[in-house]
Amino acid sequence: MQTYSTPLTLVIVTSLFLFTTQGSSSNAVEPTKKPLKLANYRATCEDRTRTLVTRLNTSHHSVVWQRYDIYSRYMRRMPPLCIITDAYKETTRQGGAAFACTRQNLTLYNLTVKDTGVYLLQDQYTGDVEAFYLIIHPRSFCRALETRRCFYPGPGRVVVTDSQEADRAIISDLKRQWSGLSLHCAWVSGMMIFVGALVICFLRSQRIGEQDAEHLRTDLDTEPLLLTVDGDLQ
């Protein structure tokens, strides 16, 4: 009897756990969908190639990669970069960077400042959406920044855009980037000034030492000669 007590206890505990889990899951309320956020993707400017990777589960779903221009006063939606379904794959060329797309990522090549914008991936099956800020500076930095309260997966698989919030978020990101760049430039300038001051102090001390040596030689050359009683020079 003692041999079967432990397995029987495990069965009872497991059954109670499953029953409790099912009851709690059936009564759980689906949380309200919040704006999607994405961790920062940092990259350097050397090769001008960026890959935007989605966290959405878009396998075997129809997806659309889209770009929003943020150089104009308001965000302007451009034609879809890439549409992928089970039946076909369609890409467009907008005169910007060359690109390659899949259901999970979008790789952009030979980026320029004109390619700055918001790149958005929408899952046509679930309606989920994920957006990337891609801020490109000619020489200083090239980064894909996290999204703010801009794009929502709305009802009917439609992307809902809060234009005012999006504008504020983009302006905030740009200010943050420029402030970071300004601090970096200020730090570099401060280091250059510090190093320059050290070099000037070193050269000045070296020059003062040379002048002291020259004065000493001059004093020795101009010191008067004295005759002793024996006729020796002093």
From Swiss-Prot:
Outline which residue ranges sit on the Extracellular face.
Answer: 24-182
- Keyword RNA-binding listed: no
Q: Write out the annotated subcellular location.
A: Membrane
**Where is carbohydrate linked to this protein?**
57, 105, 110
Q: Which UniProt keywords apply?
A: Glycoprotein, Immunoglobulin domain, Membrane, Signal, Transmembrane, Transmembrane helix
Q: Which domain of life is it from?
A: Viruses
Q: How does it sit in the membrane?
A: Single-pass type I membrane protein
Transmembrane stretches, by residue range? 183-203
Instruction: Output the Gene Ontology cellular-component terms.
Output: membrane
Which first-to-last residue range defines the signal peptide?
1-23
Outline which residue ranges sit on the Cytoplasmic face. 204-234
Instruction: Report whether Glycoprotein shows up as a keyword of the record.
Output: yes
Q: Which residues form the Ig-like V-type domain?
A: 24-122
User: What family does the entry list?
Assistant: Belongs to the RL11 family.
Protein name as annotated: Viral Fc-gamma receptor-like protein IR11
What organism does the UniProt record list as the source?
Human cytomegalovirus (strain AD169) (HHV-5)
